[in-house]
């Protein structure tokens, strides 16, 4: 067996209830994305080369976009990808952002399945 090293990290969040449940219970439909951020930050360590996140909207209408991804390089990649996602929401009013139905139909990264990846260079060759 090989000795343990800092390998790449993976985090996944699968929401089992509709986004409206999380809006009502926690005050935001972004509950899954917030949990993914927290899980990725807990894995954040030195040697990080980059990170990425993906989201799947399982309730998307036929023909509409249902998969989203964002990637970044560098030691602050986690902050960068989540900041980029938040910038996509700046053109929407707070009423639109708090409307679960609007969010799920129109906003990127509004979905039920999230996955994050952290890439490390301390495991060997890049």
Model-based region annotation:
Residues 1-126:
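N-terminal glutamine amidotransferase
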């Amino acid at each position: 067996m090989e000795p343990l090293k800092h390998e790449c990290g993976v985090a996944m969040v699968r929401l089992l209830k509709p986004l409206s449940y999380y809006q009502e219970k926690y005050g935001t439909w972004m509950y899954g994305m917030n949990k993914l951020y927290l899980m990725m930050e807990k894995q954040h360590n030195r040697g990080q080369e980059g990170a990425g996140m993906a989201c799947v909207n399982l309730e998307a209408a036929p023909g509409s976009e249902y998969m989203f991804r964002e990637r970044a390089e560098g030691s602050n990649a986690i902050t960068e990808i989540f900041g980029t996602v938040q910038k996509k929401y700046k053109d929407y009013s707070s009423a639109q952002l708090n409307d679960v139905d609007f969010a799920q139909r129109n906003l990127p990264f509004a979905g039920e399945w999230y996955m994050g990846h952290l890439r490390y260079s301390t495991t060997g060759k890049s």
